[in-house]
C-alpha cells in the first residue's frame, strides 16, 4: 500500500493491523515506530527525531546538526545540495513482506528545478528491527543540457547534536574517544579539515590516540569496511550504552571496487555512496542518468551495558548481502530501480593462483574496463569476495549482465583479467582457469610487496608507539613526521641490506614542508631517490633486455582528485623518470591528470593505482655496483584552492628488475 501525502493535511494515524509497527502523520511530520525505535521525519525529508528505547539519539535539531539520516550531494551546477530543499513531496508505503514481517517506509521525492534533477530517498522500518533500510536515487532527464557535471559526492548522514556519543570507530585500529568540546574549541588548523589539539593535551583523544584530528584518519577501503559508527559508553546516559552504525550489507551500487576508500565517521556517521576522495572515479550526470543506490542499513542498538565490540559485532553480523533478501524482494515494487533476486545469479569458480600469492580476491566489475574505473558506466554493478588458498570463490546475488573478472593477490605483480563473464538470473556461471603471472625474464630484485599499498614503508602501517591506542602512522597526518630528520641526505637504498620499513619512505615527495613544527621547505633531498644494487657476470651473461616494473599505490599530479586537465599547471601530467647508472636518457613513466589522487595528504597509502613496465638494453647495466635513480621534477608544486601541500608526489607499491 502506498500513500502519497501532502503534509498540509490534517493529522492522520494509520497502523498496520493491531501491531506495534505504526505510522502517524501530521501537517508537518511523519512518524515510523515499532516497539523499540521511533523515527520522526520532517516535511523536508530529514529524520529530525530518533529514539531507541526512549533514548534521544540525535539531540536538538540546529541547522544541519541533530538530524539524519538524510541525503545530500555535491552534484548541482552550484555544488552542494540537500535533497528536499526545493519541492519535497513525501510518500508513505507499508505492508507485510514475504517472511510475514510488517514494514513501513517513507519516500522523499524532490526535483531541483534549475536543472530538473530528481532525488528520491527511501527509509524503511521493519517490525522487530532497530534500524532504517536506506536507498537513494538520482535521475536526470534533460535533452537541452545533455551533460550536466560529474556526480562528485552523493551521501547520507546521521548527524547528531548531543553529548550522548563518546567514541567513534571504523575498525579495531581506528577507534578513539571523540574530542571534547574544549579540544574542538581550542584546536589549531594545520591543513584543510585537519586540526591539532596541542592546546588541550589532557583531552582523551589527544592522550589515547593522536595529537591531530582529521576525518580522513577514519577512512577505510571498502574491501575492509563493513560497519562503522558511534558508540556511547554510558558516561552521559546513566550507564546505558548505545551504538549507531552504518552497515554496508550490500556494496554493489558503489563504484571503484574493493580499493575504493572513503570517509566513514568523524562525529557524523556517513554513507559515502559516491565521492572522488583518494582519487576515485565518479560518474558523469548526463541525459538519461538514473541510478538507485543501496540498500544499506543504519542500525541503532544497545540499551543495556554492552561494550563497543559487542555492539559492533551485532552490526557486523548484518553486513551480508544475503541478509533480508526476501524483505528487499518484497519492497522492490516501491523502490525505483532496485533489482530483485529473480534477476540475480551467481558466479562460482577456481583460478589456479601463482606461487606466492596471498590474500587473493575475485572481483566482478563492468566488462572491458579496469575495475577502479567502473564509474565510466553509471549503471554498472560490482562484487568481490575473498578467495581461499586454492583460488576457489563464489559470488552470489549478482545482477544479470556481462562482467569483467579481475583477480589480484599480495605478492604478485599485475592482475588476472577475464572479460565477457555472463551472469543470468537464478543461474550459476562457472569459471575454471589458471593465472599466468606476468614475466619479462628472470627477476633480479624487487623492492616492496606488490599489494596495491605503500604501507610497508616508513610511516606507513607501522603502529604509532607514542599513544596507547597505537594507530597506524599513515592515518595520522603527514606533517606529524619530519623528512629532514628521517632522511637528512635523501633516500639511498641498497637492495639486500637496507630495510624497507625504515630506509624507504611511504611517499616520494618533490617538496616537503612546512609542517607545524618545522617551517623549512625542503626540495634538495626529496626529488631524487637512489636504489643501489649489484649484479654478477653470470646474471648479465647473454642478457639483452632489462625490464623495470614500477607499481604506484597512488600519485598526485597538479590535478589532485579532480581528473580535470589544467593547462596552466606544468605538472597536470607528471613524469616520474628512472635513470639507469650514468645514462642521460631516462625511462619515463607518465602519470596522467586522470590518474591523480590526493593520497598520503588525506591519510591513505592505497589510492588510484598506476603502473608501468619499461624496457631498456641490458648493456646499460654493469657487473658490480649499479644505481637506479627515481626522479621527480625538483620543487614541483601546483596552486591549491584549500590549505593543502602544493607538492606533487608518488607512493610506491613495489618495483622490480627483470632480465631476459
Curated annotation (Swiss-Prot):
Q: Name one GO cellular component term.
A: extracellular region
Q: Alphabetically, which GO biological process terms does the record hold?
A: cell wall organization; polysaccharide catabolic process
| Pfam families linked | CBM-like, fn3_3
Sites carrying sugar chains: 22, 27, 109, 142, 238, 284, 432, 492, 532, 594, 635
GO function term, MF aspect, one: carbohydrate binding
User: Record keywords: DNA repair included?
Assistant: no
The signal peptide, as residue positions, is 1-20
Keywords carried by this UniProt record: Carbohydrate metabolism, Cell wall biogenesis/degradation, Glycoprotein, Lyase, Polysaccharide degradation, Secreted, Signal
Q: Where in the cell is it found?
A: Secreted
Q: What class of enzyme is it?
A: lyase
> Is Lyase among this UniProt entry's keywords?
yes
EC number annotated for this UniProt entry:
4.2.2.23
Q: Which reaction does it catalyse?
A: Endotype eliminative cleavage of L-alpha-rhamnopyranosyl-(1->4)-alpha-D-galactopyranosyluronic acid bonds of rhamnogalacturonan I domains in ramified hairy regions of pectin leaving L-rhamnopyranose at the reducing end and 4-deoxy-4,5-unsaturated D-galactopyranosyluronic acid at the non-reducing end
Q: Which family does it belong to?
A: Belongs to the polysaccharide lyase 4 family.
Q: What does this protein do?
A: Pectinolytic enzymes consist of four classes of enzymes: pectin lyase, polygalacturonase, pectin methylesterase and rhamnogalacturonase. Degrades the rhamnogalacturonan I (RG-I) backbone of pectin.
Q: What's the protein here called?
A: Probable rhamnogalacturonate lyase B
Write down the species. Answer: Aspergillus terreus (strain NIH 2624 / FGSC A1156)
Source taxonomy lineage? Eukaryota, Fungi, Dikarya, Ascomycota, Pezizomycotina
Gene name per UniProt? rglB
